[in-house]
Structure formats: structure tokens, C-alpha cells
Amino acid sequence: MGMILTGRRVGAVEGQQLGFVNEVTPVGQSVEGARRWAAQILECSPMSIRASKQAVMDGLEAGGALAAMKAQGGFAAVRAMSRSEDFIEGPKAFAEKRPPVWKGR
């Protein structure tokens, strides 16, 4: 809250300590850092990524996640994900100790 009220700027390391910077890379290695993050995201179900993004964006627009859920009767992308093949594939792959094969449906 203090940063919002004062407009105080912070560097990358402090931003990471505060939790709004994911990774601080040495000079010249930001592309490699971004690729590491992209690779981790790509390991996830496309439907779960879509649902997560929808929840965050709708929550910002509605003044909070709870307000957005109430306004929409829940998040459409979350409902779709919970009825998807990917919803079954994640726990199944975990139980079988193998990487999941996401279908995006």
C-alpha cells in the first residue's frame, strides 16, 4: 500500500522481494529468463492458463475476484476447464508418474 500511496520506485531486486517481479537476471540474460518462464507456462494445461488469466483480468475489471464471480455466476473458462479432458489428464498423469499430454479441450 505504501508504494501505491507514495509512488516510490523500486529496483528489480526489491521488486522480487516484494513479490511482483518473478526473476532478476544478470545483464544480457533477460531473454533466457523469459524463455525459462515461458517453458514453465507451456508445461501447464492451456485451459488452466486461460482460466487463470480470465480470473485475474475479470477480477481487476470488477473490483475483485469475488465481485467478478458473483457478476458472472462464476468464471466461464473455469467451468469449461472443469468439464474438459485436460481436467482428467492432469491428475491421471500425476498418478501414473508421467508428463501430462494436454489437448486444450
Give short role names for the model-derived ranges.
Residues 8-14:
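Short, glycine/polar-rich helix-capping loops at beta-to-alpha or helix-loop-helix junctions
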Residues 3, 55, 59, 76-82:
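Helix-loop "lid/cap" segments that line or gate small-molecule binding pockets
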Residues 12, 21-69, 102-105:
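C-terminal long alpha-helix characteristic of the crotonase
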Residues 83-87, 93:
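Interdomain hinge/lid region at the active-site interface
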Residues 1-8:
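Short helix- or helix-capping micro-motifs
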Residues 92-105:
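Terminal low-complexity tails and localization/encapsulation signals of metabolic enzymes
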Residues 15, 52, 94:
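Terminal peptide-recognition signature
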Residues 18-19, 97:
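Structural motif
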